[in-house]
UniProtKB/Swiss-Prot annotation:
Disruption phenotype: Leads to higher level of PA accumulation. It comes from Metarhizium robertsii (strain ARSEF 23 / ATCC MYA-3075). SUPFAM superfamilies: NAD(P)-binding Rossmann-fold domains. This is Oxidoreductase swnN. PANTHER family: NMRA-LIKE DOMAIN-CONTAINING PROTEIN (PTHR47706:SF4), NMRA-LIKE FAMILY PROTEIN (PTHR47706). Oxidoreductase; part of the gene cluster that mediates the biosynthesis of swainsonine (SW), a cytotoxic fungal alkaloid and a potential cancer therapy drug. Swainsonine production occurs via a multibranched pathway and is dispensable for fungal colonization of plants and infection of insect hosts. The first step of swainsonine biosynthesis is the production of the precursor pipecolic acid (PA) via conversion of L-lysine (Lys) to 1-piperideine-6-carboxylate (P6C) by the aminotransferase swnA, the latter being further reduced to PA by the reductase swnR. Belongs to the NmrA-type oxidoreductase family. Isoflavone reductase subfamily. Its EC number is 1.3.1.-. Pathway: Mycotoxin biosynthesis. InterPro entries: NAD(P)-bd_dom, NAD(P)-bd_dom_sf, NmrA/Isoflavone_reductase-like.
Length: 341
């Protein structure tokens, strides 16, 4: 039995990973969080309040619990969180017990150049990054910083996991599978029967449910370090963006209102807003962040960032059943209809 520490275990990805570990019954998990709380169920993992500014304190927690694998599910939205992950990597490397580390990626290839982004536009915006605009030095990239830090610690085996966009977003708020992913609408607004796609829709797209990612992480935890790929891919569904329009029509039997935003409009941040995102963008705490997320997602689609390099984990773990996009969308649509007044 492997002891796994999940950092950010109270967030969307972290909770999903903990569910997968609990379901398998093969490993023991603990949660690293900024705050601690008493488990409400007997089988809930222990939670440890950590000071992400203290490498020494985190190292001690990892040692005392004989942690062998660390899974980071921290949401890298600013410099402070990015530094928290760097410190966690250092604590793991110094612990003497941790041998494997999964950093927070779970999206695209962060080395891929993202076109149509000028230095001026970057400098005029808040320093918030989900991906690199150049793979270089237009501004520091949090994921690349973590990768560089991991490369300094030969005692750690690590893998970068790329999954594309979470399929969970496609049917929100009608979720046919359990999801803890924060409500946010990407490409399709099922309630308002609207879609918005980038450019001509000919870009490659990967959509993976959060439960699929978690299932593969659970398998990786038990895999010997020598068999870990440096780059991993979970690609439950590979298609072109415009294929979503035909999928929606096929499943619903309706013609959704569809907008194809031009490259120029996306570049300038003039993106057709899906109605369900109105409340999201008005959130005083996270609204601006989600506007940035929307812009960056659309920009990333204009590149080849969804041509994900790495070892397909389906080849390593063929027993994992992944979520088919058509079945998922049909179930979500059926759920929506069942809730209609």
């Amino acid at each position: 039995m492997v002891v796994v520490a999940v950092a950010g275990g109270t967030g969307g990805v972290g909770r999903t990973v903990l569910d997968a570990i609990a379901k398998s019954g093969q490993h023991q998990a603990i949660v690293l969080s900024r705050t601690t709380s008493v488990p409400t169920a007997v089988d809930e993992p222990k939670r440890f309040a950590v000071d992400y500014n203290s490498v020494e304190q985190m190292k001690k927690i990892l040692q005392e619990n004989n942690v062998q694998v660390v899974v980071s599910a921290l949401l890298l939205v600013d410099e402070a969180v990015a530094q928290s992950q760097i410190n966690l990597i250092r604590a793991a490397a110094q612990s003497g017990t941790v041998t494997k580390f999964i950093p927070s990626e779970y999206y695209i290839d962060f080395h891929a150049p993202i076109p149509y982004v000028s230095l001026q536009s970057i400098l005029s915006r808040q320093r918030f990054s989900l991906f690199s605009t150049s793979g270089a030095d237009l501004f520091t990239n949090f994921q690349l910083e973590a990768e560089a830090e991991l490369s300094r610690h030969a005692q750690l085996t690590w893998t970068l996991i790329r999954v594309g966009i979470f399929l969970d977003h496609l049917t929100m708020p009608h979720n046919p599978k359990t999801t803890y992913i924060t409500p946010f609408w990407v490409f399709v607004d099922i309630d308002h029967e609207q879609c918005v796609f980038p450019g001509d829709g000919s870009q490659p797209l990967v959509l993976t449910h959060s439960q699929d990612l978690a299932a593969y992480i659970e398998r990786l935890v038990g895999l010997p370090a020598e068999n870990w790929p440096r780059e991993s891919v979970v690609a439950s569904n590979k298609l072109l963006v415009k294929d979503l329009e035909s999928l929606v029509n096929k499943v619903t039997g309706k013609k959704f209102k569809v907008a194809y935003d031009s490259v120029e409009c996306i570049h300038k941040g003039r993106i057709t807003q899906l109605p369900s995102n109105t409340a999201v963008f008005q959130d005083p705490a996270k609204g601006e962040m989600f506007r940035d997320v929307e812009h960056q997602v659309m920009l990333s689609m204009l590149s080849r960032a969804h041509d994900l390099p790495g070892k397909n984990l389906a080849e390593l773990f063929p027993e994992v059943e992944t979520t088919d996009i058509e079945d998922f969308f049909r179930s979500g649509w059926t759920l929506k209809q069942s809730r209609a007044p």
